UniProtKB/Swiss-Prot annotation:
A molecular-function term among this protein's GO annotations: protein serine/threonine phosphatase activity
Coarse class of the protein's main subcellular location: mitochondrion
Source species of the chain: Drosophila melanogaster
TM annotation in the entry: 58-77
Oligomeric form and interacting partners: Component of the TIM23 complex at least composed of Tim23, Tim17 (Tim17a1, Tim17a2 or Tim17b1) and a Tim50.
Protein name: Mitochondrial import inner membrane translocase subunit TIM50-A
Mitochondrial matrix side of membrane: 1-57
SMART domains: CPDc (SM00577)
UniProt membrane topology term: Single-pass membrane protein
Length: 343
């Protein structure tokens, strides 16, 4: 009597090998057959029939879509429900609309409000009013950016992010605080800027600190609107390394070359001399001076070149004076050079 033995795989991609009609198996053949069956079972564990896969995908998509639908409905309810007081819901301009449309319109109005909050400064006046006499109000306001003007961010694998202090920062702040109201106005977050300024200015030369929340968001870029400063713009100087941060007031900006962290930088010392000349000459409208230097790629280098040429011209004029008058003019020359024409 013959015994029919079936062996194959459940995997349809492989298919059945077929059937074999054999006699009774020997012990060795039984061992081989059992081994083959175990191998087939192990291969079939990860196999999912197409119908089962479709069911799994259906449930996955259903859960995702259901979650998204729940979130959207919750947002419509939370942002679109009417305000209430002790007497119940308060009527507004959407109260006469159909119920569902009321919620949609209120939600849209709320989202526009939050978008406007993000794009505009938090306050219409970023600085308090100038102090009245007998208190002393500096004649000019100096608005500074932090990044690449006073410090430079540096990252290494060993230390992570660090900020390198620019050469001459202490001297610059100390000298400018005599004639300028120093204001930090940066697009950096407050959690970054405030600890950095605490370490950078231990003596309190910086009077006010304005961070990202005080900027305007225009086409994805944080800009500085000087109209909110509550200061006379004819006496406001903005020092930055990005010409696009003050698009509404380019004549108030002195755009320096970006500091990249080099130790031989002397630009803050040159800037100190430039600002001291403005204060010493009591310039009525700083925008005229800044407009002139805005045409140069490196305004501080042009300023130094102008000062050298002025000094040479002054020395030539002194040499042409009679000997009796030279000593008297040399004394005035020292003062006139320190207070020489800025241009």
């Amino acid at each position: 009597m013959h015994k029919i033995v079936w062996f194959g795989t459940l995997n349809k991609s492989i298919g059945y090998i077929g059937k074999k009609k054999t006699c009774l198996l020997s012990p060795c053949e039984k061992i081989c057959l059992n081994s083959a069956r175990k191998t087939v079972q192990r291969c079939d564990k990860n196999y999912s029939p197409p119908k089962l896969r479709r069911i799994k995908n259906f449930y996955t998509y259903s859960v995702v879509l259901g979650s998204l639908f729940s979130i959207v409905m919750w947002a419509i309810y939370k942002l679109g429900k009417p305000e209430e007081d002790h007497r119940g819901p308060i009527e507004d301009e959407f109260s006469q609309l159909p119920w569902f449309r009321q919620y949609i319109m209120r939600m849209w109005h709320t989202l526009q409000y939050y978008e406007k909050m993000m794009e505009e400064p938090q306050m219409a006046r970023l600085l308090p009013n100038v102090v009245p006499p007998p208190y002393i109000q500096p004649p000019y306001s100096l608005v500074l950016e932090i990044k690449d003007v006073l410090v430079h961010p540096d990252w290494t694998y060993q230390t992570g992010w660090r900020f390198k202090k620019r050469p001459g920062v202490d001297y610059f702040l100390q000298q400018c605080s005599r004639n300028f109201e120093i204001v930090i106005y940066t697009s950096e977050q407050g959690m970054t800027a405030f600890p950095l300024l605490d370490a950078l200015d231990p003596y309190g030369y910086i009077k006010y600190r304005l961070v990202r929340g005080a900027t305007d968001l225009v086409e994805g870029q944080h800009t500085k609107n000087l109209d909110y400063l509550n200061r006379d713009l004819s006496r406001v100087i903005v020092v930055d390394c990005d010409p696009y941060t003050t698009p509404l007031h380019p004549d108030n900006s002195l755009v320096l070359t970006k500091w990249l962290g080099n130790d031989d930088d002397v630009q803050l010392f040159d800037l100190t001399a430039f600002l001291q000349l403005i204060a010493e000459h009591q310039v009525n409208d700083v925008r005229e001076v800044l407009r002139y230097y805005r045409q140069f790629e490196d305004p501080m280098e042009q300023f130094k070149d102008n000062q050298r040429r002025l000094q040479e011209q002054s020395q030539e004029s002194i040499q042409n004076l009679p000997t009796s008058e030279r000593q008297w003019n040399l004394t005035l020359l020292g003062r006139s050079l320190r207070g020489s024409s800025i241009k």
